[in-house]
Regions:
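Acyl-donor-binding surface of acyltransferase catalytic domains
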Residues: 52, 79-161, 298-302
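Short amphipathic alpha-helix that is part of the acyltransferase structural core
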Residues: 1-34, 46-48, 53, 148-190, ...
């Protein structure tokens, strides 16, 4: 028997399922709990088969989706429990919640080597709207890169200058909409309060690894490392953004070098990142280092399930 309960029933089980299915984007119970509290529109569920937790899902209107026809969803089922209707039932729950938010579509993520996950989306009429070229940088034996700053540019961190968080958000407001995506709305960081709760607080946030590029007193770029697996020594490049007027001058390269140097000094084992395949400039910065490819991340978009019954 398949039973679907509120995700808050067991954060540890939800985190384990997400991590097992996503593999390259692991999470923790603390992050699951924090994200739920930070996102007022979020609903999540845990699926059990004969009492065993085998699936997890969530649906939320992210800050950049307020004017979009889509909501964001994660639907994860452990491989051994697939082809038994668990994913379909979770899809119905996410669709019902998306409909309550006034949405007609969902955006879901899968890695390209998860054939079942990709097929699940494609069978339901979902199309790929973004392909992330995913990479990992193993730090063992890597020499610290030199940090070459353009004239008039200096680096600091949010740990040293916590007063610069609002300027960092202003850079995000300019840079994030430039990320290529085949969607009805460009990507956006949301309000400062939303940006702060998602990127400047919580268990993933590392203030001393949030680098800010300054031109005089003005923030012109930033780059964040966030924890992927703190116990395992793995951090992820969450975002690297530069104001349009300062692009092509080496600002992004200096921030990337500072991030890698910090990771080496801190004793991390690995950094992970991903860039939309059309983001040529960002991929060129990564090409300077021995990043190794991992399975591409695919963002799909498609229609919610038909309104056959109330899955809530």
């Amino acid at each position: 028997m398949i039973e679907v309960v509120d995700g808050a029933t067991d954060d540890a089980a939800v985190a384990r399922i997400y991590s097992d299915v996503m593999r390259w984007s692991t999470t923790t119970p603390e992050r699951v709990h924090y994200f739920r509290g930070a996102m007022p529109t979020l609903r999540d569920w845990l699926a059990r088969v004969d009492g065993e937790a085998v699936g997890a899902a969530r649906c939320v209107e992210l800050p950049d989706m307020k004017e979009s026809e889509a909501a964001s969803a994660d639907i994860c089922v452990l491989p051994a429990a697939r082809q038994r209707g668990v994913g379909t039932l979770l899809f119905e729950h996410t669709s019902t919640h998306a409909r309550s938010l006034g949405k007609t579509e969902l955006e879901v993520f899968a890695y390209e080597d998860d054939a079942d996950g990709v097929a699940f989306a494609e069978r339901r009429g979902f199309r790929c709207i973004m392909r992330m070229r995913s990479l990992r940088l193993v730090l063992e034996g890597l020499e610290a890169p030199s940090i070459e700053l353009p004239d008039g540019v200096s680096l600091t961190t949010l740990a040293e200058r916590p007063d610069l968080g609002h300027q960092m958000w202003e850079v995000a407001c300019e840079a994030i909409p430039d990320i290529p995506i085949d969607s009805d709305m460009p990507m956006r960081p949301g309000t400062f309060e939303e940006f702060h709760s998602l990127h400047l607080a919580g268990p993933r946030f590392i203030s001393e690894a949030t680098f800010l590029a300054l031109h005089g007193d003005d923030v012109i770029g930033y780059g964040q490392l966030e924890w992927q697996d703190r116990a395992g020594g793995i951090a992820v490049h969450e975002m690297l953004a530069v104001r349009r007027a300062f692009r092509g001058r080496g600002v992004a390269g200096a921030i990337k070098a500072a991030q890698i140097s910090w990771a080496l000094e801190t004793g991390l084992d690995e950094l992970r990142t991903g860039n939309e395949e059309r983001n040529v400039a960002a991929r060129a910065v990564n090409a300077r280092y021995p990043y190794q490819p991992t399975p591409d991340g695919l963002l799909f978009r498609g229609p919610i399930a038909s309104d056959t019954h109330d899955a809530e």
